UniProtKB/Swiss-Prot annotation:
It holds the Pfam family tRNA-synt_2d. It comes from Pyrococcus furiosus (strain ATCC 43587 / DSM 3638 / JCM 8422 / Vc1). GO terms for cellular component: cytoplasm. The lineage of its organism: Archaea, Methanobacteriati, Methanobacteriota, Thermococci, Thermococcales. L-phenylalanine binds at T342, Q381, I382, D383, F422, F447. Mg(2+) binds at E424. This is Phenylalanine--tRNA ligase alpha subunit. It is found in: Cytoplasm. The keyword Acetylation does not apply. One of its GO terms (biological process) is phenylalanyl-tRNA aminoacylation.
Length: 499
């Protein structure tokens, strides 16, 4: 069904058969946007067709429009000469700018409008007979045409004056435009012959229409509710931050207490030694961790705790023989960007916990690695532990499986035996990603008694450290971990928020 605008455009097209969009604007009085919308509907119905052609056009510049109002510099200079007959060049400064004054003698002489005389006081210009009665020049004709419409074709103007002359004088510019031409089809002509009633349409039912009863007489414009509309991108939270907030809420709802900390820097004591990781372990070397150049060292905690950790390393605790080496407090003082969030679990255990108790933290950690779609050198890790009497390894597997399925949305989960200096037994958690295959989430285990006893804990503690960025990959349906920290507007706009 055709609306008012479509009918109006079709009737006008029937009168002229073919017209440019600009011509239809004048014929119908409609805006160009409304005409294009109407033509697209008519074309879809086979009543009109739209063709395009590229064309070079000439349009006035800002300087050109200024000269239309004031006159070209040579015309203004000539007007002064007509009244005074003879003037010094300096006398023209009142009507011309410095930029206009520089070429003015050459232009006036070329046109034959003046004679130039050199005097001790400077150049003197005297008007000629030709200057008294100047003919209209090609450039004047071209500017007059351009002043009467928005633009003219290059072909039209080039017949009057060389385009380069207009460009050189910076009064006009040449552009390439796409010209759209509408033409009525035979089907459109036949429809007009049958008769078209041009009746204004109403787009909304107002209280006035109802009260007056005129709603019975007017024609309401039909709306296509399936028509595509322009997408709107309102303010939106960063998808990954929303995911992290959801994890926090879920864990707190499950009774976990969050461990918060401001610093990204740890001493090796908390990152390694308190976790019963020997000082000669390869994971402490530059290939696996970063070190601070300045300041190089930090402070150790209270002496009693340091002595217990030293004893665990050198001679062992809880029936263990330890690592059997001389532990160095100097080595433990070196500062480093945190390599894993388990360092905060050790801090919390030493600080004191509720028993039974459940704790977690989400922290930024740093490790040397090769950047790819599943690895970053700076990433987030969720670390947690549960301390209670009678806890077993099977309790840990149950928590990990719940993490992978309920939080990450993984369909398949696997556990692999693993090794960590501070847990025994230890396990690796992996989940299946439809694009990447099996992806490692992180490690877990039961904290060794050499660690927990040194930190003052006498009950079993099950713990895990999981790359939460990889959990987010599953939940947000992406196959490149770098998207989580990306400025890609397309992804940020289209990514679903996980509440």
């Amino acid at each position: 069904m055709l609306g008012y605008n479509e009918k109006l455009v079709l009737l006008k097209l029937n009168e002229v058969k073919k017209a440019r969009i600009e011509e239809l604007v004048k014929l119908t009085g409609l805006e160009q946007v409304a005409i294009m919308r109407a033509l697209l509907t008519l074309e879809k119905e086979g009543l009109a067709k739209i063709s395009e052609r590229k064309e070079r056009i000439i349009r006035l510049t800002d300087l050109g429009r200024k000269y239309i109002q004031m006159g070209l510099p040579e015309i203004r200079a000539l007007n002064v000469l007509k009244s005074k007959k003879k003037v010094k060049l300096d006398e023209l400064r009142g009507v011309l700018t410095e930029d206009e004054l520089k070429p003015i003698v050459g232009i006036l002489r070329k046109e034959g409008w003046v004679k130039v005389e050199k005097t001790p006081e400077g150049l003197v210009l005297e008007i000629t007979e030709r200057g008294e009665n100047p003919e209209e020049r090609p450039i004047d004709k071209a500017l007059k045409i351009l002043s009467e419409k928005e633009y003219a074709t290059s072909e039209e103007i080039s017949k009057i004056v060389p385009i380069n002359e207009l460009k050189r004088r910076k009064v006009a510019q040449e552009e390439e435009v796409v010209e759209r031409i509408a033409e009525i089809t035979e089907k459109g002509v036949e429809l007009v012959k049958k008769g078209i009633e041009l009746k204004r349409e109403v787009t909304s039912l107002t209280p006035e229409l109802i009260a007056s009863g005129k709603w019975r007489e007017v024609e309401f414009k039909p709306f296509n509710i399936k028509a595509p509309v322009k997408k709107i991108y309102p303010g939106k939270k960063q998808p990954y931050r929303v995911f992290l907030d959801k994890i926090r809420r879920k864990l707190i709802e499950m009774g976990f207490i969050e461990i918060t900390v401001d610093s990204l820097i740890e001493t090796q004591f908390w990152n390694f030694d308190a976790l019963f990781q020997p000082q000669n372990h390869p994971a402490r070397e530059w290939t696996d961790t970063y070190q601070l150049k300045y300041p190089e060292k930090g402070y150790l905690p209270n002496r009693e705790l340091v002595e217990r950790v030293k004893e665990a390393h050198e001679r062992g605790l809880a029936g263990s023989r330890g690592w059997g080496y001389v532990w160095s407090p100097e080595r433990a003082m070196f500062l480093m960007p945190r390599a894993h969030a388990t360092a905060l679990s050790a801090r919390q255990l030493a600080k004191g916990i509720e028993i039974p108790g459940k704790y977690f933290t989400i922290q930024r950690v740093f490790r040397p690695d090769v950047l790819d779609r599943t690895h970053l050198i700076e990433f987030n890790q969720i670390d947690g532990f549960v301390a209670a009497e009678d806890l077993t390894f099977r309790h840990l597997l149950g928590i990990l499986k719940k993490f992978a399925i309920e939080i990450a949305g993984a369909k398949k989960v696997k556990f692999f035996p693993d090794y960590y200096p501070f847990t025994e037994p230890s396990v690796q958690l992996s989940a299946y990603h439809p694009e990447l295959g099996w992806v490692e989430f992180g490690g877990a285990g039961v904290f060794r008694e050499e660690m927990t006893k040194a930190l003052g804990i006498d009950v079993p503690v099950i713990a895990w450290g999981i790359g939460i960025d990889r959990l987010a990959m599953f939940r947000l349906g992406i196959d490149d971990i770098r998207y989580l920290f990306s400025y890609d507007l397309k992804w940020l706009r289209e990514a679903k928020l996980i509440w």
